[in-house]
Amino acid sequence: MPDITRRRAYTTAAAVAATASAAAPTAAPAATAAARHDHTAPDSFDEVYKGRRIQGGPASGGGHHHEHGGGYAVFVDGVQLHVMQNADGTWISVVSHYAPVATPRAAARAAVDELQGAPLLPFPTN
């Protein structure tokens, strides 16, 4: 039986480590992804936040195929705030696009904070 060289031992150890690291994460992300995706629709809301009326609820149709709100509409003082649900379940809006939040209500509140009293202007959709 030939002597084991350092190169052969290193190659074997690297192969074992690569196989172990490739097999280990396959079960964990599936479990966390299942826990993260809640397939229930967000609750409707209608409240005054910092003097602005914010509303949200299931979208009433309209036939817009380009909307990404997942069938959910949000309004600030009667003007639609375009929202989008990310793949990880967080929400963003056109006003606070780089600050994902947990719910459409939080997206509306973040938009009010960002607007600092300025009116929300209608977003052109073509």
Swiss-Prot record:
Keywords: Copper, Melanin biosynthesis, Signal. Predicted to be exported by the Tat system. The position of the signal peptide cleavage has not been experimentally proven. It holds the Pfam family MelC1. Residues 1-33 form the signal peptide. GO terms for biological process: melanin biosynthetic process. Gene3D superfamilies: protein ne1242 domain like. Residues 21-71 are annotated as: Disordered. InterPro entries: GriE/MELC1_sf, MelC1, TAT_signal. Residues 21-34 have a biased composition (Low complexity). Transmembrane segments: none annotated. PROSITE patterns: TAT. GO terms for molecular function: copper ion binding. Belongs to the melC1 family. NCBIfam families: TyroCdyMelC1. This protein may function to deliver copper to tyrosinase. This is Tyrosinase cofactor.
